[in-house]
Swiss-Prot record:
Its main location: membrane. It is a peripheral membrane protein. Mn(2+) 2 binds at D41, N79, H114, H195. Hydrolyzes the pyrophosphate bond of UDP-2,3-diacylglucosamine to yield 2,3-diacylglucosamine 1-phosphate (lipid X) and UMP by catalyzing the attack of water at the alpha-P atom. Involved in the biosynthesis of lipid A, a phosphorylated glycolipid that anchors the lipopolysaccharide to the outer membrane of the cell. SUPFAM superfamilies: Metallo-dependent phosphatases (SSF56300). It catalyses: UDP-2-N,3-O-bis[(3R)-3-hydroxytetradecanoyl]-alpha-D-glucosamine + H2O = 2-N,3-O-bis[(3R)-3-hydroxytetradecanoyl]-alpha-D-glucosaminyl 1-phosphate + UMP + 2 H(+). Pathway: Glycolipid biosynthesis; lipid IV(A) biosynthesis; lipid IV(A) from (3R)-3-hydroxytetradecanoyl-[acyl-carrier-protein] and UDP-N-acetyl-alpha-D-glucosamine: step 4/6. Belongs to the LpxH family. The gene is lpxH. This is UDP-2,3-diacylglucosamine hydrolase. Substrate binds at N79, R80, D122, S160, K164, K167, H195. InterPro entries: Calcineurin-like_PHP_ApaH, LpxH-like, Metallo-depent_PP-like, UDP-diacylglucosamine_Hdrlase. GO terms for molecular function: manganese ion binding; UDP-2,3-diacylglucosamine hydrolase activity.
Length: 246
């Protein structure tokens, strides 16, 4: 069985090259997989399942086509598209996952997550994350006119960009102790996440001296990144965007 994992594509109308590369990926590499896991931030922002923008419709069709081909699709919310709802998931043929999803991978107890919850040193972001997860606040936002939601999303993006420029790189990475705590709470030895845009396979030593691995998926920008797990290997793969879309 072949399983693929991607995250942090940040699709938007301003990057047609990424849209084309993603659709090509779904029509080629993903067609050979049994399962595809999207671990958050597929879109640059998400203002509601009811938007029905050309981009949303295009991606819905591409994902539904893959699902109809027999590939099971799973989605973990990111910090940019945390309001993706059941309607969009059903239209795509995707299953929505909880914030931390325990499963069995390559004979190991594994955890799948977006990864932003591990960046606990960034207290300002964690405060923002808690506030935006309030159900009543999401309900109010989703009942605003679409034009107003777009403006709010743009303001949040601009604020996020300015905030990142003022933060050190270390504070925006995962906190090592939070990683260990997450591993040990779930009794896992393998973790797969995105968010930090720092693709790497890390060896981790837990408190009991038990070895574990943390695999960080890369973001799609000049290169696309995906993790491939089959019965034999675990491979973190990258490919230039300009060749992936041809």
């Amino acid at each position: 069985m072949t399983k693929l994992f991607i995250a942090d594509l940040h699709l938007s109308e301003s990057r047609p090259d990424l849209i084309q590369a993603f659709i090509h990926f779904l029509e080629t590499e993903a067609r050979t997989a049994d399962e595809l896991y999207i671990l958050g931030d597929l879109f640059e922002f998400w203002i509601g399942d009811d938007e029905q923008s050309p981009l949303q419709q295009q991606i819905t069709h591409a994902l539904r086509t893959l699902a109809n081909h027999g590939c099971q699709l799973f989605y973990s919310h990111g910090n940019r598209d945390f309001m993706i709802g059941k309607r969009f998931a059903q239209e795509c043929g995707m299953t929505l996952l909880p914030p931390v999803y325990p499963c069995e991978l390559a004979g190991e107890k594994a955890l799948l997550l977006h990864g932003d919850q591990l960046c606990t040193d960034d207290e300002a972001y964690q405060r923002f994350r808690r506030i935006t997860s309030w159900p009543w606040l999401q309900w109010i936002f989703l009942h605003l006119p679409l034009s107003r939601r777009v403006k709010i999303a743009q303001q949040i993006r601009q604020g996020s960009h300015k905030g990142k420029q003022q933060k050190s790189r270390s504070i925006m990475d995962v906190t090592p102790q939070s990683v260990i705590t997450c591993f040990e709470q779930h009794k896992a030895t393998l973790m797969i996440h995105g968010h930090t845009h720092r693709p790497q396979i890390h060896d981790v030593t837990l408190s009991s001296n038990q070895p574990a691995r943390r695999i960080v998926l890369g973001d799609w920008d000049t290169d696309l990144w995906y993790l491939k797990i089959d019965d034999r290997d675990i491979n973190l793969i990258s490919q230039p965007i300009n060749t992936a879309k041809n």
